[in-house]
């Protein structure tokens, strides 16, 4: 079977690829880099002074058409069983399945086989599958 491709694959443009880092995280080791909104009354970052760190805001949002889109052009849909997989039957050109982390390896095999029959792309088909020589 040929590789499954999305119906359309628009160019995904990110307005910012750098991470937003927390104010003064470069100055103190105890302050982690993970973003926290500054809430102090005299804070320069919150006030938006020139030359300060940038704060995440609505303007950095993605295009509606490409939001949550994977580089392959599909959007992810989390699947726990075969019944949930069959929901994607009509929209297999725009959505791909991702098997949930808590699905057993026995059920994973069934889901992957059914996805191949329905021509649905699975992002993690080889996860938790043992090779034949180990058995």
From Swiss-Prot:
One Gene Ontology cellular component: cytosolic large ribosomal subunit
Cell compartment(s), UniProt: Cytoplasm
UniProt keyword annotations, A-Z: Cytoplasm, Ribonucleoprotein, Ribosomal protein
InterPro entries: Ribosomal_eL32, Ribosomal_eL32_CS, Ribosomal_eL32_sf
Main location: cytoplasm
GO biological process: translation
SUPFAM superfamilies the record matches: Ribosomal protein L32e
Protein name: Large ribosomal subunit protein eL32
Highest taxon, organism lineage: Eukaryota
Taxonomic lineage from the root: Eukaryota, Metazoa, Chordata, Craniata, Vertebrata
PROSITE patterns: RIBOSOMAL_L32E
Family (UniProt): Belongs to the eukaryotic ribosomal protein eL32 family.
Subunit-level organization: Component of the large ribosomal subunit.
Record-level Gene Ontology MF annotations: structural constituent of ribosome
Function, in words: Component of the large ribosomal subunit. The ribosome is a large ribonucleoprotein complex responsible for the synthesis of proteins in the cell.
């Amino acid at each position: 079977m040929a590789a499954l491709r999305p119906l359309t694959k628009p160019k995904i443009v990110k307005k910012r690829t750098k991470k937003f880092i927390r104010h003064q995280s470069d100055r103190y080791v105890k302050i982690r880099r993970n973003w926290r909104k500054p809430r102090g009354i005299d804070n320069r970052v919150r006030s938006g002074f020139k030359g300060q760190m940038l704060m995440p805001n609505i303007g950095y949002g993605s295009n509606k058409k490409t939001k949550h889109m994977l580089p392959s052009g599909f959007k992810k849909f989390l699947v726990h069983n075969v019944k949930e997989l069959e929901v994607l039957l009509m929209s297999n050109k725009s959505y791909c399945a991702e098997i949930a982390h808590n699905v057993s390896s026995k059920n994973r095999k069934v889901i992957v086989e059914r996805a191949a029959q329905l021509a649905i792309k699975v992002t993690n088909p080889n996860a938790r599958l043992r090779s034949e020589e180990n058995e």
